Regions:
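Minor-groove-contacting beta-hairpin "wing" of winged helix-turn-helix DNA-binding domains
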Residues: 123-132
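Short glycine/proline-centered loop/turn elements that form peptide/ligand docking sites
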Residues: 68-70, 86-87, 106, 110, ...
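Short amphipathic alpha-helical interaction segments
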Residues: 98-113
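A short, conserved structural fragment
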Residues: 112-123
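Short acidic, hydrophobic short linear motifs in intrinsically disordered regions
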Residues: 84-97, 108
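Short alpha-helical segments that sit at the start of domains
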Residues: 49-77
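Short helix-capping/hinge SLiMs at alpha-helix to coil transitions
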Residues: 80-85, 226
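Long, low-complexity, charge-rich intrinsically disordered regions
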Residues: 1-41, 48, 141-263
Length: 263
């Protein structure tokens, strides 16, 4: 392309640029690295001879507003549970939830695309704020929420020397009239180092009293856990797709209590 560009410029006696269809970020980066001017409307423009640099629209294209990413749900929950109705610095949320700059940027972009938050300048930083009261914020987000459970494993109870939180039917039974399950259920983050060291067993071959079911979560439940239990909104999400009438009634009871406390 550089040789062709030189021929065109010699023939036309002026700088030239290519109109391209960028299929991915790598293609765009390769053109920039090679110094080849290009235009890919509406947002990617690289005309160095005019002092114009491209505007990256890939972030918005890659952020879909159908279901929350794990990091997005973390930011959503942080804004839901915080007592302050005012805005909060995006950097503060990222630090509190241990999110990278890329993760917090994509998470807030997705929440903004869903119409749940707004972003605004605050000095030299960016602040974020809910677009609704806490109740409306939750109601408008329900369709986007994901099940945080990546996988469920069973281990022997004596292995549970790590921090974990009451989850699943165990936690639900503590918040409703549901009877507790035969095997206790608890949750940890799937990225914890201890996960690779756990020995998975077949509960059918063991005494249920000696076993624990461990939910491996896509985000760290410790950030929102209270009184040793996973947070109520995340707990309800772990039962997505469960059509057991007992569970459905207990979740409604759980959420009613949550609404009374939060809203």
């Amino acid at each position: 392309m550089k040789k062709q560009k030189a021929k065109y410029e010699e023939a036309l006696q002026c700088p030239v640029a290519y109109e391209v269809a960028l299929n991915n970020v790598s293609m765009r980066n390769a053109l920039v690295k090679s110094g080849v001017p290009f235009v890919n409307l509406p947002g990617n423009v690289f005309l160095p001879f005019m002092g114009i640099v491209l505007q990256d629209v890939y972030r918005k294209q890659l952020v879909k507003a159908d279901k929350m990413m794990p990091a997005t749900q973390m930011v959503f929950l942080e804004l839901l549970y915080m007592s302050d109705e005012e805005s909060v610095l995006k950097s503060e949320v990222a630090n509190k939830l241990n999110l990278t700059k890329t993760s917090i940027t994509r998470a807030t972009a997705q929440l903004e695309e869903m119409g749940l938050i707004q972003q605004m300048k605050s000095g030299t930083e960016i602040a974020i704020k809910r677009n609704y009261s806490r109740k409306e914020y939750y109601e408008n987000a329900k369709g986007y929420l994901i099940n945080p459970v990546q996988k469920v494993i069973t281990i022997m109870r004596y292995e549970a020397t790590f921090e974990s939180f009451s989850a699943g039917e165990t936690a639900l039974s503590q918040e409703s009239e549901l009877n507790p399950p035969r095997i206790e259920e608890r949750a940890i983050y799937k990225g914890e180092e201890v996960v690779d060291q756990l020995e998975i067993v077949d509960a059918r071959s063991e005494d249920p009293d000696d076993c624990l079911k461990i939910q491996l979560w896509k985000y760290n439940p410790s950030y929102f856990a209270r009184e040793g239990r996973v947070d109520p909104v995340s707990l309800a999400c772990t039962f997505k797709g469960n059509e057991d009438e007992r569970i459905e009634m207990s979740i409604e009871e759980l959420l009613e209590g949550t609404r009374d406390r939060l809203f």
